[in-house]
């Protein structure tokens, strides 16, 4: 099974920069003029220093992908880490005057078994082999497509580009400050928010033919007094064999949260509102296997 080799950042950052940029310069599309090359070099140096300070380690191929986004002028600079988890790191970046979120999947620690399960049931993808590289590229492509579809229908960040294990999307926040999660909000009109979220789930299902799959107060941000759905990596199309068990779980999570806010919510009623059908006991039993 193929796998990227994880290489810690060199103690001498100049050596690391030299090696990475030598590889980049071999690509014809990255023949940069001297001044721009100097500018990019300083941004790369700062990025590596920030990674070292945060004890973040990426394999060489991932670093090259991130640097190629600077060299190709897809991004202007990386600013800092927004969120760091077991399977992915989210950076804040800029593209001119616009902020971007850059999601980088950790090749060494991703749960490829779970990823494969969600991908293989999706008719949009056909994995002939189960190599780590192929799985993670398909996973990023899946999230990219899901975000593109969702952002046309509901309040969700628009995906801008994907490259290998890196996904670039719109940054949800205020002047570079990340928008708060729903779980951290106080004194909202909870009835109003439940209604908006309920309608968004229904629109996503009916118009987008998507189920979020990991929806909770942790994956909903609040911006301009509106909920914003994020993290569509586990989202599946409605034809997927796990779509309805995942939707039931989403309904349970949402109702559990809003009941704590004293909003009347029953997950079975929410599911029926979204799908127009009663819950199938077989689908509900499958939740334990997710």
From Swiss-Prot:
<dbReference type="InterPro" id="IPR051272">
    <property type="entry name" value="RIO-type_Ser/Thr_kinase"/>
</dbReference>
<dbReference type="GO" id="GO:0106310">
    <property type="term" value="F:protein serine kinase activity"/>
</dbReference>
<dbReference type="GO" id="GO:0046872">
    <property type="term" value="F:metal ion binding"/>
</dbReference>
<feature type="domain" description="Protein kinase">
    <location>
        <begin position="76"/>
        <end position="290"/>
    </location>
</feature>
<feature type="active site" description="4-aspartylphosphate intermediate">
    <location>
        <position position="231"/>
    </location>
</feature>
<keyword id="KW-0460">Magnesium</keyword>
<feature type="active site" description="Proton acceptor">
    <location>
        <position position="214"/>
    </location>
</feature>
<keyword id="KW-0808">Transferase</keyword>
<dbReference type="InterPro" id="IPR018934">
    <property type="entry name" value="RIO_dom"/>
</dbReference>
<comment type="function">
    <text>Despite the protein kinase domain is proposed to act predominantly as an ATPase.</text>
</comment>
<dbReference type="InterPro" id="IPR018935">
    <property type="entry name" value="RIO_kinase_CS"/>
</dbReference>
<dbReference type="Pfam" id="PF01163">
    <property type="entry name" value="RIO1"/>
</dbReference>
<keyword id="KW-0378">Hydrolase</keyword>
<dbReference type="GO" id="GO:0016787">
    <property type="term" value="F:hydrolase activity"/>
</dbReference>
<keyword id="KW-0723">Serine/threonine-protein kinase</keyword>
<feature type="binding site">
    <location>
        <position position="219"/>
    </location>
    <ligand>
        <name>Mg(2+)</name>
    </ligand>
</feature>
<protein>
    <recommendedName>
        <fullName>RIO-type serine/threonine-protein kinase Rio1</fullName>
        <ecNumber>2.7.11.1</ecNumber>
        <ecNumber>3.6.1.-</ecNumber>
    </recommendedName>
</protein>
<dbReference type="InterPro" id="IPR000719">
    <property type="entry name" value="Prot_kinase_dom"/>
</dbReference>
<dbReference type="InterPro" id="IPR011009">
    <property type="entry name" value="Kinase-like_dom_sf"/>
</dbReference>
<keyword id="KW-0547">Nucleotide-binding</keyword>
<keyword id="KW-0479">Metal-binding</keyword>
<comment type="similarity">
    <text>Belongs to the protein kinase superfamily. RIO-type Ser/Thr kinase family.</text>
</comment>
<feature type="binding site">
    <location>
        <position position="231"/>
    </location>
    <ligand>
        <name>Mg(2+)</name>
    </ligand>
</feature>
<dbReference type="InterPro" id="IPR008266">
    <property type="entry name" value="Tyr_kinase_AS"/>
</dbReference>
<feature type="binding site">
    <location>
        <position position="103"/>
    </location>
    <ligand>
        <name>ATP</name>
    </ligand>
</feature>
<dbReference type="InterPro" id="IPR000687">
    <property type="entry name" value="RIO_kinase"/>
</dbReference>
<keyword id="KW-0418">Kinase</keyword>
<keyword id="KW-0067">ATP-binding</keyword>
<dbReference type="GO" id="GO:0004674">
    <property type="term" value="F:protein serine/threonine kinase activity"/>
</dbReference>
<feature type="binding site">
    <location>
        <begin position="82"/>
        <end position="90"/>
    </location>
    <ligand>
        <name>ATP</name>
    </ligand>
</feature>
<dbReference type="GO" id="GO:0005524">
    <property type="term" value="F:ATP binding"/>
</dbReference>
């Amino acid at each position: 099974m193929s796998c990227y080799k994880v290489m810690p950042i060199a103690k001498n950052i100049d050596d690391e920069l030299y090696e990475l940029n030598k590889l980049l310069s071999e690509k014809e599309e990255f023949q940069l003029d001297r001044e721009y090359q100097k500018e990019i070099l300083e941004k790369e140096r700062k990025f590596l220093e920030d990674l070292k300070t945060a004890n973040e380690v990426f394999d060489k191929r991932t670093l090259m992908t991130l640097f190629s986004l600077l060299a190709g002028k897809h991004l202007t600079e990386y600013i800092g880490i927004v969120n760091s988890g077991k399977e992915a790191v989210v950076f804040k970046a800029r593209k001119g005057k616009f902020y971007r979120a850059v999601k980088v999947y950790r090749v060494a620690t991703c749960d490829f078994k779970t990823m494969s399960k969600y991908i293989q049931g999706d008719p949009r993808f056909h994995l002939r082999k189960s190599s780590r590289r192929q799985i993670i590229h398909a996973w990023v492509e899946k999230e990219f497509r899901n975000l593109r579809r969702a952002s046309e229908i509901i309040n969700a960040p628009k995906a801008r580009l994907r490259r290998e294990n890196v996904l670039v999307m719109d940054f949800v926040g205020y002047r570079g400050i990340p928008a708060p999660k729903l779980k951290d909000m106080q004194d909202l009109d909870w009835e109003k928010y439940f209604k908006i979220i309920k309608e968004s789930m229904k629109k996503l299902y009916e118009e987008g033919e998507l189920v979020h799959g990991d929806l909770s107060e942790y994956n909903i941000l609040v911006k301009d007094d509106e909920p914003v759905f994020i993290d569509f990596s586990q989202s599946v199309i409605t034809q997927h064999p796990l779509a309805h068990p995942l939707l039931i779980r989403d309904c349970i999570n949402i109702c559990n949260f809003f009941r704590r806010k004293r909003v009347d919510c029953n997950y079975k009623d929410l599911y029926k509102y979204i799908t127009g059908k009663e819950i199938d006991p077989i689908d509900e039993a499958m939740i334990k296997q997710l």
